[in-house]
């Protein structure tokens, strides 16, 4: 079944501009509170200008262009401008440093980069090293350095025609993006995403949250991340909704922004929920129009109940990863939600729990969550230039091995246990980091927690907890270990604890455990 009707991203935007015209498509708010707004028609014009800019710089179908940007309208212009001429976007995590960024440029053979003034010094050094194919930089900012191979994005883009001057033949099977995974445990892999993937993501995620053209979808997720692209931007645009993109997350400003833009849908990760909960209670806490909060793992039942009760919202759980494009398991529109289940498998997918011999397991037994989709359509096409890694993750029949542990109940609801690489082996027992983190996070003095396994000569691995306390709190080791002993089996109690001011995180809020080992 061809859900997208053979429509590529160029056709999508031309149709959206014709159907919705002056209706607001995009609202962007900077950290300084500066607001920029675009209708569907004007946004399509900006996209066309950007496509023509890339063409004027020698970019053609199949060429790869990197974006190293914080959230901004120009990211949207570039994303779809590249797609309109058949070129390929390579978004770079805005938190990456020089060596990490250079590795992605080299791996994907990028010759052109769009970035902002704050990241320019890093890329000037990369160009001078001649270690990558990078030979031209389009810079977004007020001032332009007097360097060869650098052009002013806004000045050149604004002079372009709003009519496309290069329209190569496009197929929904064409690659639109290479999105490198976060690489919390190893070098990132380039996930190849097609036009079909993105069009499907728009329809699927709009179905998941029952999105309509009178909805306002607000997000603080980074635009270079799959969540922002495929569970926020694509469904919002596909449904003709208004997409509100904030430059950065602020716990103090979040609810005022929800009210300011009359958002009806937003998305949250656990870090956001925890920081919102430590803000002072206000009479306006429940004064908003939110009907759904898209939520991504992982939260304890106590945290979930406290959040939903205080703010009068409900969480719509969605489970997925870069390779699945969307939340392939999740709560469904109108269905009763069964916390802590991550929901049921969505339309056009199959899901199974499998053992270490790749055999399906019955309800109630823990194994690996495996997903069946269509490569290049409902799941990613492949890892860029890594056929062996692709073969390990993706079976020929379309079964994707997620690397996550979970189980399902008799009614087909799935439950996430942990990343398989996060299971600690302690004296013959398997201990879930997520389970311990959920228990420990209930301590009233603790704001953030992560558990890791460290080498132990006797028991294979010992358990260590890294903790961030609420402001002004103190916590002794005796108090911490007593709490653990009273709330978990003895073999699960951590052997060590360390208090920190913060925990290292990637762009999607996931803690980078390799920095804590």
Curated annotation (Swiss-Prot):
Catalyzes the transfer of CoA to carnitine, generating the initial carnitinyl-CoA needed for the CaiB reaction cycle. Also has activity toward crotonobetaine and gamma-butyrobetaine. This is Crotonobetaine/carnitine--CoA ligase. The lineage of its organism: Bacteria, Pseudomonadati, Pseudomonadota, Gammaproteobacteria, Enterobacterales. The keyword Ligase applies. Belongs to the ATP-dependent AMP-binding enzyme family. Pathway: Amine and polyamine metabolism; carnitine metabolism. Its EC number is 6.2.1.48. HAMAP family: CaiC. It catalyses: 4-(trimethylamino)butanoate + ATP + CoA = 4-(trimethylamino)butanoyl-CoA + AMP + diphosphate; crotonobetaine + ATP + CoA = crotonobetainyl-CoA + AMP + diphosphate; (R)-carnitine + ATP + CoA = (R)-carnitinyl-CoA + AMP + diphosphate. One of its GO terms (biological process) is fatty acid metabolic process. One of its GO terms (molecular function) is carnitine-CoA ligase activity. Pfam families: AMP-binding, AMP-binding_C. Keywords: Ligase. The keyword Lipid biosynthesis does not apply. It comes from Salmonella paratyphi B (strain ATCC BAA-1250 / SPB7).
């Amino acid at each position: 079944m061809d859900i997208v009707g053979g429509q590529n991203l160029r056709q999508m935007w031309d149709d959206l501009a014709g159907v919705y015209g002056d209706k607001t498509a995009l609202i962007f708010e900077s950290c300084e509170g500066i607001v920029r707004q675009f209708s569907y028609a004007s946004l399509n014009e900006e996209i066309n200008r950007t496509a023509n800019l890339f063409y004027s710089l020698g970019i053609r179908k199949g060429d790869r262009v990197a974006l190293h940007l914080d959230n901004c309208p120009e990211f949207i212009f570039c994303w779809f401008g590249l797609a309109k001429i058949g070129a390929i976007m390579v978004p770079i995590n805005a938190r990456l440093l020089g060596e990490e960024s250079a590795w992605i440029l080299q791996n994907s053979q990028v010759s052109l980069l769009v970035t902002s003034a704050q990241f320019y010094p890093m890329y000037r050094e990369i160009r001078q090293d001649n270690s990558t194919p990078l030979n031209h930089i389009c810079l977004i900012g007020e001032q332009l350095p007097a360097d060869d191979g650098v052009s002013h994005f806004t000045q050149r883009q604004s002079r372009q025609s709003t009519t496309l001057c290069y329209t190569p033949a496009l197929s929904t099977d064409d690659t639109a993006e290479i999105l490198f995974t976060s690489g919390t445990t190893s070098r990132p892999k380039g996930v190849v995403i097609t036009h079909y993937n993105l069009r499907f993501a728009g329809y699927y995620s709009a179905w998941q949250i029952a999105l309509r053209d009178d909805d306002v979808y607000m997000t603080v997720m980074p635009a270079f991340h799959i969540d922002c692209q495929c569970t926020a931007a694509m469904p919002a645009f596909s449904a003709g909704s208004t997409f509100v993109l904030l430059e950065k997350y602020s716990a103090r400003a979040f609810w005022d922004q929800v009210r300011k833009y009359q958002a009806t849908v937003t998305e949250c990760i656990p870090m956001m929920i925890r920081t919102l909960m430590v803000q002072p209670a206000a009479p306006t806490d429940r004064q908003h129009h939110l009907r759904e909060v898209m939520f991504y793992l992982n939260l304890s039942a106590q945290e979930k109940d406290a959040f939903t009760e205080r703010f009068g919202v409900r969480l719509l759980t969605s489970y997925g990863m870069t390779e699945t494009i969307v939340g392939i398991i999740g709560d469904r529109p109108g269905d009763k939600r069964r916390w802590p289940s991550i929901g049921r498998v969505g339309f056009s997918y199959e899901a199974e729990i499998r053992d270490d011999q790749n055999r399906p397991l019955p309800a109630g037994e823990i194994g690996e969550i495996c997903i069946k989709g269509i490569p290049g359509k409902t799941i990613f096409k492949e890892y860029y230039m890594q056929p062996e890694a692709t073969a390990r993750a993706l079976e020929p029949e379309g079964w994707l091995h997620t690397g996550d542990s979970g189980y399902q109940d008799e009614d087909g609801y799935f439950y996430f246990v942990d990343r398989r690489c996060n299971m600690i082996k302690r004296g013959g027992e398997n201990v879930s980091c997520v389970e311990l983190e959920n228990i420990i996070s209930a301590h009233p003095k603790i704001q953030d927690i992560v558990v890791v396994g460290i080498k132990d000569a006797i028991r294979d691995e010992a358990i260590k907890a890294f903790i961030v306390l609420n402001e002004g709190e103190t916590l002794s080791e005796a108090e911490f270990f007593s709490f653990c002993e009273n709330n978990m089996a003895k073999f699960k109690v951590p052997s060590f604890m360390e208090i920190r001011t913060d925990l290292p995180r990637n762009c999607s809020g996931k803690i980078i455990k390799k920095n804590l080992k």
